[in-house]
Amino acid sequence: MEKQLLDVLVELNGVWLSRSGLLHGIRNFEITTKHIHIETDCGARFTVRNSRSSRSARSLRHNKYRKPCKRCRPADEQIDRFVKKTFKEKRQTVSVFSSPKKHVPKKPKVAVIKSFSISTPSPKEASVSNSIPTPSISVVKDEVKVPEVKYTPSQIERLKTLMSPDDKIPIQDELPEFKVLEKELIQRRRDDLKKMYEEDREDRLGKLERDITEFFVDRGFLEIKSPIMIPFEYIERMGIDKDDHLNKQIFRVDESMCLRPMLAPCLYNYLRKLDKVLPDPIRIFEIGPCYRKESDGSSHLEEFTMVNFCQMGSGCTRENMEALIDEFLEHLGIEYEIEADNCMVYGDTIDIMHGDLELSSAVVGPIPLDREWGVNKPWMGAGFGLERLLKVRHNYTNIRRASRSELYYNGINTNL
């Protein structure tokens, strides 16, 4: 049965589930060409892509929520409707007469390795055996019971780094020995690298930078290249004091200089200076590396590449900001949702989400911070992490595959 679009799910449920798990009553919603604009009973506004496969659509198909919104106070009937899904229509049963089908012998089913996970014995099991518990690989398979083959943690990590998002390893009776599987994956990655060398020869991160540059230059934006080392004073002027968590993530060069953790400070300076020269509106953008002492994870890097684009003067509205973001992500072929949020530096922001991954935070000014930089006109701007865009486009499980790295080239492990 075909999945319903988000607007149908909103109408059927009669409630909205925010990213934080709050259940809201719906005051009104409107549908445009690609988006649905929702206003809740508490006055919150959400703009999301009208998609069947978005995070919002998936959440409305289920019946779990964290708690009702205290300001909306949805009625018990609304909550009951969402939880029990009483609106679902029963499927009709249709009898069809047809000629008997010819018997075709079934082919033996083949299991496919799709993912790895480490499992260890329970304390009770561990007490029975004196041997050291060995991690094992769990196999996602299609109705075939396969004996579990045990690999060491280092072997599992090695296989993970060698596998690509599209890898499927067919097996008949049991998992192959580690050396056999490793050899097969190494040969695949060597073939992938040879194919890239013969057909493309472009680094994906560099290619994305060039593609984004062309996109914004064609739309009248001036490209900026600002210093990577900036005065630490810029950080303080962004409202980040010594008690803020971002302050602890900054790479300091000496007492007065640091590696930039963001592009915004220098873009603020450019807006102020160019306002004396360029016609209204002023449009600028920059692509470049930033540095933060980020925690380890599948979505964070200490060295990452940002694109920030902003416009100052006339036409700086939320509608124009969302339209530009929509055009940009459609150009890159990336689906997204828009959600309202709040951050320490800019206050109210427009978050651009792909599933649970934040791609960007956009802001429509003026905001109180502008006074610190001598900017006194309306503006709008957004920033995207290029490695996150690549992670989404190529379905990488770990963002390091998209980063500046010696370990990976275009997502392929180079230790072959």
UniProtKB/Swiss-Prot annotation:
Q: Do you know which Gene3D superfamilies this protein is assigned to?
A: Bira Bifunctional Protein, Domain 2, Helix hairpin bin
The protein's name is Pyrrolysine--tRNA ligase
Keyword match Nucleotide-binding: yes
Q: What is its main location?
A: cytoplasm
Q: Looking at the UniProt record for this protein, which Gene Ontology cellular component terms does it annotate, in alphabetical order? A: cytoplasm
Name residues in a coiled coil: none
Can you provide one Gene Ontology molecular function annotated for this UniProt record? Answer: tRNA binding
* Annotated catalysed reactions: tRNA(Pyl) + L-pyrrolysine + ATP = L-pyrrolysyl-tRNA(Pyl) + AMP + diphosphate
- Tell me which species this is from: Methanococcoides burtonii (strain DSM 6242 / NBRC 107633 / OCM 468 / ACE-M)
Tell me which family the UniProt entry assigns to this protein.
Belongs to the class-II aminoacyl-tRNA synthetase family.
**What PROSITE patterns does the record tag this protein with?**
AA_TRNA_LIGASE_II (PS50862)
Keywords from UniProt, A to Z, are:
Aminoacyl-tRNA synthetase, ATP-binding, Cytoplasm, Ligase, Nucleotide-binding, Protein biosynthesis
EC number(s) on record?
6.1.1.26
Q: What is the lineage of its organism?
A: Archaea, Methanobacteriati, Methanobacteriota, Stenosarchaea group, Methanomicrobia
Tell me, what does this protein do in biology?
Answer: Catalyzes the attachment of pyrrolysine to tRNA(Pyl). Pyrrolysine is a lysine derivative encoded by the termination codon UAG.
Q: Where in the cell is it found?
A: Cytoplasm
Q: Name one GO biological process term.
A: tRNA aminoacylation for protein translation
